[in-house]
Amino acid sequence: RADKVHILNDDFAVTWAGSVSEAQLITKLIRAELKLKEIRTNKKTNAKETANLLGGLIYSSIRRPSMLPGIAHFLLGGKDTDGIHLYDLFPDGSVTKIPDYVSSGSGSVFAYGVLETKYNKDMTVKEGIELVKLAVNTALQRDSASGNGINIVVVNQNEVKKVYRKE
């Protein structure tokens, strides 16, 4: 069992799918890089900088020679002075800014069925949490590789906070 949702710092959180060991290593590296950058520059990184830094780490990980290639797909959510941001980071290191919602992993096709029919840009946080529960639960019921639990993190202008966990 691996927790697939991680808070990186006060401003950002990631989810991941793919190779657990690779994703865990990249998560540790991005946490350290964000802290180092903050110490060196005496300022927090913005969302675009964080996404590009994470994309670079992902890209470099697939270029490492290895007997066991690690492939990991990340979603990054966070906040900065410009607002709330969502990014999709593919296993090749490419970075895509997402305007509304995104899903990743083998169960994402099932989650998208729920998201595409029920998502509304004017939803409350409570409604959004219920939608995420439904989408992830749908994926869990139909895809054995999706895991066995639900973790929800809410990002708003005030905080990045875990709000729901079910095994």
Where in the sequence are the language-model features?
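Acidic-glycine-rich active-site phosphate/pyrophosphate-binding loop
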Residues: 76-92, 167
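Short gly/pro-enriched beta-turn/loop segments at secondary-structure junctions
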Residues: 67-72, 80-84, 147
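A broad, low-specificity signal marking well-ordered, structured residues that form hydrophobic/aromatic
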Residues: 12, 74, 87, 150
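Short hydrophobic alpha-helical segments used for membrane anchoring or interfacial signaling
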Residues: 76-79, 153-157
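Short arginine-rich
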Residues: 136-146
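Hydrophobic beta-strand positions in blades of beta-propellers and related beta-sheet-rich domains
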Residues: 84-88, 152, 160
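Acidic, glycine-rich active-site loops and adjacent beta-strand->loop/helix elements
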Residues: 20, 80, 93, 135-137
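Conserved short S/T/G-enriched processing/targeting/catalytic segments and their helical context
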Residues: 1-69, 95-131, 144-146, 156-167
